[in-house]
Amino acid sequence: MRIKLLKKVTARLLILLSVFFISCNTRQKVKLGSGSAVRLSKDKELKLIGNRFFTLSTVVRVNQIETSRNKSDGTDESSVHSLEEARTFREANEKGWPGARITWALSWLALKDHRPNYMDLKKLVVSYHEKYGDEITFIPGGYFANMYNSRAQVNLDLHEGLQMVSEMVGRGYRPQSVIAGFLSPENLRYLAEEEGIHICQGNIWSQYAVDNGDGEGSISYPYYPSREHFCKPAQCKADLIDCINLDGWIVDFLTARFSGIGNGDIYSRQGVGPIETVLFPGTELGTKEMIATTAAHFDTGFALNKFAWVSWIWELCLVEGRKIYGYNGRNGMDGVAIWLSEMRRRWPEAKCITQGEFGMLWRSQFKNNDRLNYCFVMSGSGIRGSEPEMGIRWFMNKDFRLALLSNRKGQSSEKVIDFTRYDLKAKEPADPSGGQPIRNWSLMNRLNQKGTRAQDKPINIDELNENEKAIIKSRYPQFVKKF
């Protein structure tokens, strides 16, 4: 009898202990991101189609371009990385867009830095994850990992960098995405198959002759990358890497056709990027340009594509970068406030979510690249290289990208300025060796918008050969009625 009674008491005690531990674990889970749980629940049924999205990301680093674990190019920016800059940035975003969830990417050196300002800053970033639901992730190689490091080394950096992020945040945290600038297919494959990460900002659309690397030739909206080249959309199941490739910054489609920076007053990266758009021209012109570029996606682009996306990375150093770089005494934060306020006024239903969340929404909608058919139309904003008389139409899909440029002053027909074919074989450069970086990873074939090669001259669409016309006709028959 005593044995039976003891068994009953023991069983009940075990049940009570189980309930207690489950309750404790549940409370811990609620505590982790308890402020974000309410926000996340509101977007539980969020779909890609029918919505406008804004992804806002920032980078925490020590040096301007950390090309590898222990080598850097450019200026030491540690003096403008502190609690003050981080609070200024995050509070401005929350004020301008209440409920926004943003993505923080930390460099290798920032993760390793044990100085008080970096330790305090990292704790603050973790608190934003818990309070707002922000994503925290890793950035390898200062946007240019493959230009300076072997693919194997980049994989190792990704593995250990992501591990450091998980340890920093704690409680089994894992980001949904990575910020990388440019990233080779081998590293995108590694992220998907070995790290379980299926979203990467792995291309900078139209970047050429800017900073430390070139990667011109991709489409500007999300796609599954090919195993041949990160700029190329996968052509079939065997070619597909299950890591969505995202652009980092939308740019003005008209200024994007130029090469480099500082061509007079023309900056090819003008659009929403902080340096070329706000810090150089100033707040008045800069915010006008940012709103015009945003409208090309949130108005016309939304009507054409049934969803819209504006991507933006603002490095944390820029909050007080004027202390290092001058920037005519500007920090751009007033421009950010105006831009965010105007976005909220004009498109109140737009969603500001993390890069990882947006990528996963896209991934749930598209299982491959077969149905991709992105169309964009933009007229010049009148600011610098975005001439008011110019207009451009872009068509982007799995097979090719096509750009048609028009001039309302005297030009009788649109000109083809870009026809990049993705049905052709593509090949990336080999790994860098001997301490010599490999800068140019662009994908250029038939005709490229930058005009850097002798063959890159604008042509009438009827000057394409019969095979090229047939390729375009398969997607857009309206363009070949004249042929």
Range-by-range predicted roles:
Residues 36-41, 177-304, 379-384:
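Active-site-adjacent pocket scaffolds in enzyme catalytic domains
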Residues 406-482:
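Acidic-aromatic substrate-binding/catalytic surfaces of carbohydrate-active enzymes
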